Amino acid sequence: METSQKYHTCGSTLVQTIDAPLSLVWSILRRFDNPQAYKQFVKTCNLSSGDGGEGSVREVTVVSGLPAEFSRERLDELDDESHVMMISIIGGDHRLVNYRSKTMAFVAADTEEKTVVVESYVVDVPEGNSEEETTSFADTIVGFNLKSLAKLSERVAHLKL
C-alpha cells in the first residue's frame, strides 16, 4: 500500500528570549502589514485584503537568492491581550505548502524586562523531500526571523533608556 504524500506533515517549535519588554516586542511582532521591519527575507509587503487585523491577507515579495519570489499569507488570529497570532500561508511559489504558525509572546519568568517568544508551525512535506529537510529549511527561516526580531527589539529598547 502506497502512503499518500498529501497528508505528510512536520512541525517544530522555536523559542527566543529577548532583552526587551513585552509591550515593545509585541508592538513590532503584531504588525501583520509590516513583517519586513524584522523579517529580513521580506522585500515588500502589501495587504490585498483587510486592514491588518484578523482575516487580512498579505502579499509578500521575498528577497532574491531564496528559492521563492512571493508568498500569500492570512492572519487567522491576533489576540493583543494574550499576545498570540496565528498565520497561514495560502499561496506562493515556495515549498512551505499549508504552512500554519502560532506565535506567542510572554514576559520572561526571571524579569519583566525580558520577553520570551515561542513560534510553532506545521507544514506539508513536499514530495521528494524528507521531514528532516523540510523542518531544517523552515527552522532556519523561523530562527533567523526570531533572532532578527530580538536584535531590533533590543536596539529599540536600549535607545529608549
From Swiss-Prot:
One Gene Ontology term of the molecular function aspect: signaling receptor activity
Renumbered residue ranges of the record's region START-like: 3-154
Keywords, sorted A to Z: Abscisic acid signaling pathway, Cell membrane, Cytoplasm, Membrane, Nucleus, Protein phosphatase inhibitor, Receptor
Alphabetized SUPFAM superfamilies for the sequence: Bet v1-like
Subcellular location: Cytoplasm; Nucleus; Cell membrane
Swiss-Prot/TrEMBL site (Involved in interactions with PP2Cs) positions: 67, 130
Motif extent (Latch loop): 94-96
UniProt note: domains: Upon interaction with ABA, the 'latch' and 'gate' loops change in conformation leading to a tight dimerization and the creation a surface that enables the receptor to dock into and inhibit the PP2C active site.
Physiological role: Receptor for abscisic acid (ABA) required for ABA-mediated responses such as stomatal closure and germination inhibition. Inhibits the activity of group-A protein phosphatases type 2C (PP2Cs) when activated by ABA. Suppresses the phosphatase activity of TOPP1 in a dose-dependent manner in vitro.
Protein's name in the database: Abscisic acid receptor PYL11
Organism (species): Arabidopsis thaliana
Gene name of the record: PYL11
